[in-house]
Amino acid sequence: MEDEIWAVVHRHLKSIFERDSATYVATTSEDLSLYEWWVTPHRQDGLDFHRFMIEHSWAGSGDYRYDLLEPRLQLYGDTAVVSYTFMLSRAKPEGGVSHRTHNESRVLIKRDGQWQIVHVHKSPAWQAPFGNEP
């Protein structure tokens, strides 16, 4: 079951970077709640926010890879919590590679035999108290 949950998480994440809104919608609950710390300090609800961003290629384009550092899965029946440090690596058009990291938690539930993401929380991956971003 853990492999099944991680497969959904990876399909979900790839859909964001590959502008695949159909897969994003299939792997995400309509009543999604999320915190994107770099966008706004307030909760956002529903799919419209990310669907708009996906359709307008907010994640950029070009060659990328992501890694989930220190992944953890906690399973409670039909509810799962995954947490990790998300590291995104992108090829720069002028050459070289850039990296960004942040921490994520995602909550999934199993409805009608399918796992869907119902909550996302992202936070900075630098040490508190907040000063200048490293």
Language-model features and meaning:
Residues S89-S98:
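Short, cysteine-centered beta-strand-loop-beta hairpins and adjacent loop/turn segments enriched
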Residues T28, F86-L88, H121-P124:
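Short beta-strand segments enriched in hydrophobic/aromatic residues
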Residues T101-G131:
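Short beta-strand edge/turn micro-motifs at domain boundaries
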Residues H12, H50-I54, L68-L73, F86-L88, ...:
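Hydrophobic/aromatic beta-strand elements that line small-molecule binding cavities or substrate pockets
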Residues E70, G77-T79, D112:
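Residue-level signal for tight coil/turn positions that link beta-strands
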